[in-house]
């Protein structure tokens, strides 16, 4: 909150504005992205996809569950959001973020109602599907870029990688140790990891590229 704003409790006022006031979140984000793109967007821009975890103590925050928490480096009670960032040689900034809802929430309508989760946000989506939707939204607004970078949590997903290829996007994804590398000739929709560590006498490569 602006330091000169005359309110008794600025932090509480901000929480009330964000959580209870009526305002168009998507319109605000669209305006923010347009402002940042005007200054920093480049054709060589890179989209970065990753999890953002928010440690929590209770059980009432939307989407909270016990899972690996990157912020703490261990399994803990936390929220998990899919985030998309944009990077160029001159700048790096967040584009969008959406909470991931695990089955423990989606299978409990009463819990969703109590937390005030809108009906349109109750879809059963993988994190990869959420990431693709966030990418589509940013690119539909004209943000340039043809390369996506993602961690292993996304790189292990064939539908996610295929979705990127179908959109004409190249990608660099970390992979799980149990995966091999993709054949260079693999086609969209039929790509399968191939472990060639035995052929090379060493460990399999740990990145997937297309």
Where are the model-predicted features located?
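Short, conserved catalytic/metal-binding motifs centered on acidic residues
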Residues: 1-3, 45-57, 84, 148-154, ...
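Short, basic interhelical loop/turn and adjoining N-cap
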Residues: 4-16
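Catalytic cores of large soluble enzymes that bind and process phosphate-bearing ligands
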Residues: 6, 24, 123
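Short, well-ordered coil loops that connect the C-terminus of an alpha-helix to the N-terminus
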Residues: 7-8, 42, 90, 144
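Charged, flexible boundary elements
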Residues: 13-35, 127-133
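Active-site-proximal, Lys/Arg-enriched surface segment
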Residues: 22-103, 108, 113-114
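An internal, acidic/charged active-site-proximal segment
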Residues: 110-210
């Amino acid at each position: 909150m602006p330091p000169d704003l005359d309110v008794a409790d600025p932090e509480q006022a901000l929480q009330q504005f964000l959580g209870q006031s009526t305002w168009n979140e998507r319109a605000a984000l669209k305006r923010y992205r347009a402002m940042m793109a005007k200054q920093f967007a480049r054709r060589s821009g890179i989209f970065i996809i990753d999890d953002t975890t928010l440690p929590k103590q209770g059980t009432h925050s939307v989407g909270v569950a016990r899972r690996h928490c990157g912020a703490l480096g261990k399994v803990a009670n936390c929220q998990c959001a899919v985030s998309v960032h944009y990077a160029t040689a001159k700048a790096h900034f967040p584009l969008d973020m959406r909470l991931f809802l695990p089955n423990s929430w989606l299978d409990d309508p009463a819990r969703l109602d109590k937390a005030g989760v809108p009906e349109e946000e109750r879809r059963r989506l993988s994190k990869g599907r959420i990431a693709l939707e966030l990418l589509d939204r940013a690119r539909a607004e004209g943000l340039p870029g043809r390369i996506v970078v993602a961690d292993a949590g996304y790189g292990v997903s064939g539908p996610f990688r295929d979705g990127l290829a179908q959109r004409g996007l190249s990608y660099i994804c970390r992979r799980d140790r149990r995966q091999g590398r993709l054949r260079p000739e693999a086609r969209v929709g039929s790509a399968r990891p191939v472990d060639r560590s035995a052929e090379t006498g060493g460990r399999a490569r740990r990145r997937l590229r297309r």
